[in-house]
Amino acid sequence: SLVSDQPMSNEETLKGATNRLDNIQNLKANFFVSIEGGVDLLDDNYEAFAWIVISHKNKISKAKTATFPLPLKISKLIQQGYELGDADDIVFKRSNSKQQNGAVGILTDNVINRTDYYSHAIILALIPFTNTKLY
């Protein structure tokens, strides 16, 4: 995505999602979807989120997931240079959690898993493509 392994701001995370989309445009598809997760500092603690960028027929739409606060132990590890997934593994004594249910799944006890977490933002990013008369 041509950004940091752990995007550290809203802007950097959106840039990563946009770069991911640019990198797949040469493939044959009707829709292109990219996702980039990141963190941003809010009141001395990090919160996590992701950007979704979708393109279809030269039109681009973007949507952001809900944000959620990260535990202070994880925030401190991120400040030390760890990626969120690695910080999760350390704090929660797991392995490869970012490829499973991620921080959102761990922190919500899987009430919201990664698929659910991203799906609302994907649906929201699709709005301009499903309501073409309005966009």
Predicted features along the sequence, with ranges:
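Anionic-ligand binding patches
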Residues: 4-135
